[in-house]
Amino acid sequence: MSQITMRQMIEAGVHFGHQTRFWNPKMAQYIFGARNKIHIVNLEKTLPMFQDAQEAVRRLVANKGTVLFVGTKRQARDIIREEATRAGMPFVDHRWLGGMLTNYKTVKQSIKRLEEKTAALENAAESGFSKKEILEMQRDVEKLERSLGGIKNMKGLPDAIFVIDTGYQKGTLVEAEKLGIPVIAVVDTNNSPDGVKYVIPGNDDSAKAIRLYCRGIADAVLEGKNQALQETVAAAQEAAAE
């Protein structure tokens, strides 16, 4: 698992919070001080908390768990998609659809529609559809793919959710709380840590910082998968030896 260092966090600007006038008092315990009217996050707290989050992810995935990566704001979208894909985990990078978890039954129907439309599009030319009809089908598929593409292979509700910017993803937190799904989240000085099981206090606007968090969590996922694989192989060898 990648060992993130204090130096890497400083270089990525993890310690830069929001303007002091926008602060959330619930984040006071994680704030070191202020510089030029900007809150400075205490990285001596952030680093071990991030490591705790990584360890929780590793354990969960080693037990065949699923982590849903969520980051729909502009700076986070591409990074969330890339790192979740690298880790082989589901993600939401475009827009959080209300009921994505609490109304998962309906979402599953939409995913089925996406699969059917994708299959129909692949055979559209041979099936005699006009160019105009094919173009309309493409637009439909692209629209559904944007909203649901990252979760189309998710087998059921996730076991945990990793979130960038709790203020931006309020809907995600509300649904996770309703369903009792633990949340691992980057929480900046202007947001509340309420409803987050594993808080990572830090900058949620810098692309460099977001890349650092996502890479660290994705690495933890891959380590958990590797552990699960090793345990499966060891069990198979043991069974064969008996």
Swiss-Prot record:
GO terms for molecular function: structural constituent of ribosome. GO terms for biological process: translation. Keywords: Ribonucleoprotein, Ribosomal protein. SUPFAM superfamilies: Ribosomal protein S2. Belongs to the universal ribosomal protein uS2 family. GO terms for cellular component: cytosolic small ribosomal subunit. The keyword Repeat does not apply. The gene is rpsB. HAMAP family: Ribosomal_uS2_B. The keyword Ribosomal protein applies. PROSITE patterns: RIBOSOMAL_S2_1. This is Small ribosomal subunit protein uS2. CDD domains: RPS2 (cd01425). InterPro entries: Ribosomal_uS2, Ribosomal_uS2_bac/mit/plastid, Ribosomal_uS2_CS, Ribosomal_uS2_flav_dom_sf.
